[in-house]
Amino acid sequence: MTLFSYLVSVAENENFSEPERLGQLAGRLLPKLSQQQRWSLGWLGHYGVGMLFALVYVHLWRSGKLKHDLLTRIWLGGVSGIIAVAVWKATFKAHPRPPALSYDKYYIQLVPAHMVFALFAGLGYQMLNRNHHCILNKSEYAKINR
């Protein structure tokens, strides 16, 4: 997903990197942060949200609420992208010093970026699921989620 955003950034000649935007927003709220701290916060936030999305996907697949197929992964990514657009819009609106940015282009690229993320999250899930000792099977998962 992040690579997708970087590629769109190059094509549009504008920075759409989510971790860099998060770091920029943090730095504008806390100007005493060093560049390294801003960078770290941006990446930590970006990966943290990515982990939350991935955990939701795994829950939906493990519980049997959604199929684990290509179409479902694309759909999950699209829904995740729409959620991301809403969260980013709210974040930029609430921030006292939002960045100068082509917001429409930024929001539009978030949807396919999240589709890419969901496709690769599904691929990772599929690869890990082949090793039964790595991930709980459905009956074990159901027991701990009662």
Model regions: which residues?
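Short amphipathic, positively biased membrane-proximal segments
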Residues: 1-146
